[in-house]
Amino acid sequence: LGIAGLQRFAMAAMGQGGARGTTTGPVNLMVREEPRQNWWPNDWHPADRAYAYGAPITRLALTSNALGGAVSDPYRRLETLFKKEVKRRGGSVQVQQARPITNTQQTQQSDDQIVLHEETSAPMHALLSLANTESHNFTAEVLLRQAADQWDVRAASASAHRWMQQQGIPVRGLRVADGSGLSRNNRVSSQTIAALLMRMDQHPYAAYYQASMAIAGQRGTLRNYFIGSPIQGKFWGKTGTISGVRSISGILQTSDGPRYVSMISNGASRPNATIGQILRIVYNLSPCPSSI
């Protein structure tokens, strides 16, 4: 949700329909939000939570809960800005917080309830592109939960693990702890990632999946890498970085077809140089005669 969306919401809540000065009386707003202890996965490092990339994961978020750094209390920010907007339009508002309703409770809601306002998200392929091209952690975390229809990160992570197993992807040693990779408890091998890339290249939405990635020397987190090299514009990938760890995985297009590449560096002194060397070798590598 952006600030413009909040303004539209305030107008709808006051019954103005976009006009000023036609308030119907005090506005009572109940925000159904996760309790604070659920805003971050438990194993996210406390230092990460102060930065935009470690912003709290809430159901209703303004500007992805980031404003320079992370917004430490998204609910209070929403309350403050909503009250200010309603007051600016000549109204008053009372805001209270409640727990989110469950899927069961949603099905039990009365049919006579009326939706006053709805904010539609960007299309799925745009959200996936934000997560993969720009490594936007908040979006990645929300996509994990929405895909599993489970806001509990442990349940959502278990659902992702089961899906990979159902696809025939080797999951030995795999541990999914969150959606963004910021947790130090994630465990994955380059074999698993390469197998996932190959499987997704056969998926009905393969074109959308590849288009969601950064492009070497052109776009996203790879925009400043491999410029002027043979792989510029020919490698679609996803990068990952936490303290001491550097990873890159993706699809390298060659004259002999696609190569599914995954590299994970732990504690290397110059990982980017090594990654570049390996990508160039793979690009120039011809397939074995027996595989043609």
Regions found by a protein language model. Give the residues of each.
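Extracytoplasmic
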Residues: T24-P26, W39, A55-I57, R77, ...
